[in-house]
Amino acid sequence: MSLASVLATVPTRQSYMHLSSAEKTVFYVVMAVSLALMIAQFLRRLPVWRKGVPIHWKPDPLGSIAKFILGQRKVQSSRPKSGAPMHLMIFYGFMALFLATTLLFIAVYGQAVGIPNFHKGAYYLAYESVFDVLGMLFVVGVAWAWGRRINLLRQHGPTVVNPETGKPEFNGNPLSHEVKDHLVLALLLLLGVGGYVLEAARMANTPQPWDYYAPVGYALSKVMPAISNDVYRGIWWSHAALVAVFFITLPQMKIKHIFTATLTAAGHNPEASMGRLEPITMAQVEETGRIGVATADQYTQWHLLSLDACMTCGRCTEVCPAHNVGKILNPKQVVADIARAAETGEEVAAAVSEEALWACTTCNACVEACPVLIRHVDMIVDARRHLVAEGRLSGSGATVLRQMAGTGNAWGAPAGNREDWMKGLNVPLARDGKPFEVLFWVGCAGATDPLGMRTSRALVDLLNKAGVSYACLGNEELCTGDPARRLGDEFQFQAQAEMNVAAFAKYGVKRVVTACPHCLNTLRNEYGDFGATLEVL
């Protein structure tokens, strides 16, 4: 039939076909109860989230949801060959099916409030064609996800729990393999395939001349035998039952992140920087009576919410350099441990283990990889701050802090030796009083480590040949304090920062060049909290 001929028949479809009034009532009750149970389970999580400290930043809910949820920004940047395309198919396929269901709901029930039935004619044909095809994204994506999970299980074997710690041992498989992980994918696949089976059954039961506008359902109907009314109703109720099961079990499955990740994105700090840690003030210490985080309820409410968004995908663990060289740190397990501590009230350091906390390099690779915006490093450093305040840091970390307090640098070199690398070079010093445009920030390694000193001398040679107007602070330069901050000694860092910022103000420093990546990050991203306005290169 031509399109004009099809439109002349006013194509549409009957809702609740072959269902009696009593069956419709039962359906409404079942859906209402299942939705109520789903909502109740999420509401039971509210007290856990509200234990935390209120956020102090102003979120951008619409912008963050558009970027990280609808745009899937973080998903696209990790696992580009497997996880990303698979998840994008599932997400956008799910969104298409959700939109299709919402439009159908409005068309059917909107008439009660005066909205005319628009689910017919050309709109209906377009609706059937577009959503029938887009729904296959969901089915293929879920099948891919389940197949990938099974393949990884075959390659690496099941997750083994360490009898001493009671925690899973990482065996090279980034995914966890609980039974419910497979059940949720089976349920999603049944929902997706079941929707097409139901559509095909409707066509086989009551053929219409426009059925071919839904190509997937139409093709499936051609291999079906004639469907009686009772068989159709049985298929319809089977699909409805799966939907009810989905609603009821959703809060207990990792698929719950469709809600919790959206809430996490809505509350995300749009000003959060990968390289900046949140400072602590003495006023905060006096108000709370603590430094850092001892128990999970001392994290912000947003951090506690973000823990529930974790779907244990393992992206964070895959990219963790400490984990990849055999250290105990497993960022995925850190999130699970803190989430457990939020439930039990256990000390965070005990739940995670102090060894794991100190193994973190604070590189933020885990944060960059996480598709649901969890800030692992913030939580780890806050726990470290508590340990340092309690005097529970020993070994090389404690040595670094003592050296920094005594000499002004993490290497323990005498403060008066920071100009030794300049011997034989014509290096201008800020204290000489000559005007300069750029401050060359040398850093502790550049001033005291033999290899670092070679780099500093080479950079001076380049600056001289380029005719740059520059100067160094020499012995007036102190460590930026970055090692102290990353280890958890926030106030040692702040003392160093304030002295350096005072030196910048003294010499009118506005532009800085440095060869040290750690110094670059601290000067560019963190010194602004202490009054410095710098362009750092």
Where are these regions (language model features)?
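Membrane-interfacial loop-to-helix junctions in multi-pass inner-membrane proteins
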Residues: 78-86, 125, 129, 165-186
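Juxtamembrane inter-helical linkers in multi-pass membrane proteins
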Residues: 51-70, 153-176, 210-220, 259-287, ...
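Alpha-helical membrane-embedded segments
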Residues: 30-39, 138-142, 189-190, 229-266
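Membrane-interfacial helical/loop segments at transmembrane boundaries in membrane proteins
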Residues: 1-17, 108-126, 159-169, 201-232
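Juxtamembrane/interface segments at transmembrane-helix termini
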Residues: 38-56, 106-111, 144-160, 197-211, ...
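Iron-sulfur-cluster electron-transfer modules
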Residues: 3-147, 151, 298-307, 329-333, ...
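Hydrophobic alpha-helical membrane-insertion segments
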Residues: 88-102, 182-204
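Ferredoxin-type iron-sulfur electron-transfer modules and their immediate structural context
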Residues: 247-359
